[in-house]
UniProtKB/Swiss-Prot annotation:
Catalysed transformations (reactions): 5-(methylsulfanyl)-alpha-D-ribose 1-phosphate = 5-(methylsulfanyl)-D-ribulose 1-phosphate
Name recorded for this polypeptide: Methylthioribose-1-phosphate isomerase
Entry keywords, A to Z: Amino-acid biosynthesis, Isomerase, Methionine biosynthesis
UniProt source species: Gloeobacter violaceus (strain ATCC 29082 / PCC 7421)
Higher taxonomy: Bacteria, Bacillati, Cyanobacteriota, Cyanophyceae, Gloeobacterales
Binding site for substrate: 53-55, 93, 197, 248-249
Amino acid sequence: MTFSAVQSEIRPVQWNGHTCVLIDQTVLPGIYRTIEIRTSDQMATAIRTMIVRGAPAIGVAAAFGMVLGWQEAPQGDPITHLERVAATLRATRPTAVNLFWAIDRMLTVARRDPSFARLEREATAILEGDIATCRAIGEHGLLALPAAPERLRLLTHCNAGALATAGYGTALGVVRSAHRADRLERVYADETRPRLQGARLTAWELVHERIPVTVLADTMAAHVIGRGLVDAVVVGADRIAANGDTANKIGTCGVAIIARHYGVPFFVAAPWSTVDLNLSSGEQIPIEQRDSEEMRAIEGVALCPQGVEFYNPAFDVTPASLVTGIIVESGVYAPGELAAAGQVRLGR
């Protein structure tokens, strides 16, 4: 496809006053299309089916799902209806904590100031705040990258870019900042089975911005890192426990183990809203199990014989001991520093 129909800046979630417009990420890179979301149930379906995906992006989408829910509410008892909408949205994706953070924030506002205008402003603030947050993550991440070589080769897993956020991205925010500072030689993007977010989405974003990218089969990461072709690994996150254990797309932990073995720094880039200080470790992070059809076939073409069984967790947990640094909008922290910094941020 050409990029003539694509905005210069990728915005996966947009609000037009009474409906929400999403980039349909299930059909990229071959087709670029948007879908208009008119109801809260449609938004829940879009999140569950990964039309919109990525922890920050589904938080933003859920916030506007709550605005849509308010529009649907019967007169006289909108809060009860909104609580039902919140429950439906919460049930869509269990691992990404940004979803719950955004819904709780919207409910708090609705109970304090129950009006459409106030909810719309809050959802818009979540969207705009996420873009600013991602840009800050990008700048902090740039400073955390190795000083040498001057032009870096970075490896990433899955898609933690503009498509996974309100715009700019977390891990790809670091990539974009490095590119703009002329410190980026190349990105290696793991294809990220089974849904191929690296091959389909990360590569699409980077080609769109003319950033050099090489797609790898997931099984190639050890070979490429071991041959000295990678200077640092930067990934996103769907939930980070207080001790720095990080849930991210399945396969991330394996990349972290490889990076540690070969002495390559491994960074996690995510907003503070992804950090769950209520969980002491990654053992408490719920791991979403997805449909076996994602592994059985690609675009209807069977990959395995009939009769086999599938195990399809969407995420794994990378132990904090394998993480060099966690890049958030306020700076870069060693995993052991995260909880204290989070408590200070909350004023506790």
